From Swiss-Prot:
A zinc finger (C2H2-type) spans 128-150, 159-181, 185-207, 213-235, 241-264. GO terms for cellular component: cytoplasm; nucleus. Gene3D superfamilies: Classic Zinc Finger (3.30.160.60). Pfam families: zf-C2H2. This is Zinc finger protein SNAI2. GO terms for molecular function: DNA-binding transcription factor activity, RNA polymerase II-specific; RNA polymerase II cis-regulatory region sequence-specific DNA binding; zinc ion binding. Repression activity depends on the C-terminal DNA-binding zinc fingers and on the N-terminal repression domain. Transcriptional repressor that modulates both activator-dependent and basal transcription. Involved in the generation and migration of neural crest cells. Plays a role in mediating RAF1-induced transcriptional repression of the TJ protein, occludin (OCLN) and subsequent oncogenic transformation of epithelial cells. Represses BRCA2 expression by binding to its E2-box-containing silencer and recruiting CTBP1 and HDAC1 in breast cells. In epidermal keratinocytes, binds to the E-box in ITGA3 promoter and represses its transcription. It comes from the Eukaryota. The gene is SNAI2. Interacts (via SNAG domain) with LIMD1 (via LIM domains), WTIP (via LIM domains) and AJUBA (via LIM domains). Interacts (via zinc fingers) with KPNA2, KPNB1, and TNPO1. May interact (via zinc fingers) with IPO7.
């Protein structure tokens, strides 16, 4: 064990360390807020007395919180006030300039968009244009109706039947025509097939004997409305089908043909 640990030493309590003391009228300001601004923690060297230990700011005034800052200090940054605030760089207009400083050309789409935004009426004047014939319409529904019915370029498109050589303008007309080949409506009594449901319904009445359509001028009745409509023409005063041989008139073309086939009186 070293000898220094075995030697008893007496400690003099009356002896104090020689700390440098400040003047009585000086005030030490710790880092805090000075009127809402942060006080710099790095003071100027000439303000401190010799022998101070910590880098704190010292001002010789009785009211430190309302006194002006020492000369040469800025309340915001702690740097000398001669430097002033660092102003932000002016905004650079990079909208139409490239990195070389020359103006970059604006595309046609951007120019059209800028002109449309500058003129609010241009947006209202925007119309729906047909891509086939370049006609414009104020509503989308009007454009759709034009494409379906009235567009000449669209009418040149045709839908062909896979069972025959017929062609149709619309797909709906083609589907109605295909039913004449497939005949989906079949009679359960005799097995006869029809393309339309109303044709099947009229056929079933020939089996049941039902005749719901009666003539108001005579006692005849019919199973189908179209037959009643043709019969009503016989009661009409207008008979537009005339025989060329005897000048006799008929209300229906079928009656005229029957008259000519049976033998016209004038022909003999």
């Amino acid at each position: 064990m070293p000898r220094s640990f075995l030697v008893k030493k007496h400690f003099n309590a009356s002896k104090k360390p020689n700390y440098s003391e400040l003047d009585t009228h000086t005030v030490i300001i710790s880092p805090c807020l000075y009127e809402g601004y942060p006080v710099p923690v790095i003071p100027q060297p000439e303000v401190l007395r010799s022998g101070a230990y910590s880098p704190i700011a010292v001002w010789t005034t009785a009211s430190p919180f309302h006194a002006p800052l020492p000369a040469g200090l800025s309340p915001l940054s702690g740097y000398p006030a001669s430097l002033g605030r660092v102003s932000p760089p002016p905004p650079s207009d990079t909208s139409s300039k490239d990195h070389s400083g020359s103006e970059s050309p604006i595309s046609d789409e951007e120019e059209r968009l800028q002109s449309k935004l500058s003129d609010p009426h241009a947006i209202e004047a925007e119309k729906f244009q047909c891509n086939l014939c370049n006609k414009t319409y104020s509503t989308f529904s009007g454009l759709g109706k034009h494409k379906q019915l009235h567009c000449d370029a669209q009418s040149r498109k045709s839908f062909s039947c896979k069972y025959c050589d017929k062609e149709y303008v619309s797909l709906g007309a083609l589907k109605m025509h295909i039913r004449t080949h497939t005949l989906p409506c079949v009679c359960k009594i005799c097995g006869k097939a029809f393309s339309r449901p109303w044709l099947l319904q009229g056929h079933i009445r020939t089996h049941t004997g039902e005749k719901p359509f009666s003539c108001s001028h005579c006692s005849r009745a019919f199973a189908d409305r179209s037959n009643l409509r043709a019969h009503l023409q016989t009661h009409s005063d207008v008979k537009k089908y005339q025989c060329k041989s005897c000048s006799k008139t008929f209300s229906r073309m079928s009656l005229l043909h029957k008259h000519e086939e049976s033998g016209c009186c004038a022909a003999h």
